[in-house]
Amino acid sequence: MEMENVLIVDDEVDICYFLKRNLDRKEYTTCFVNSLKEAQKLIDEDRPLVLLLDNHLPDGLGLDFAEKVKRDYPEVKIVMITAHDTPKDRISANRNGIDYFISKPFMMKEVFRALDVVINRA
């Protein structure tokens, strides 16, 4: 499997470590940050293939950030992982360029399925 570059953006450090540890085992190249400001810097420098993005971060909403990322870097795939899962949230996610939506709490098999879908989507 070719190693894919994944950026994890979540303010919950335990979730970041959990995702990183499990993704590293599956040969993904990962790193994580805890704010949108840090995420923007890494995206500008390294252009990850996939962004695993929480919606509620200390410096803003992931949905708003996703819209900007998709405008500037349309090739970046975005998987939103959030505890806020209402029909309105899913509609907003779809409109803002989210490629896949996962509700917290989640299982790693959901994350692996999401990555498989967005990476292999034609």
Protein language model regions, located:
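The feature encodes the CheY-like receiver
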Residues: 16, 58, 86
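Acidic catalytic/metal-coordinating carboxylates
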Residues: 34-35, 61-64
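Short amphipathic alpha-helix used as the core "switch/output" element in two-component signaling
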Residues: 63-73
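Alpha4 helix (beta4-alpha4-beta5 surface) of REC/receiver domains from two-component response regulators
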Residues: 64, 85-100
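C-terminal output helix
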Residues: 106-116
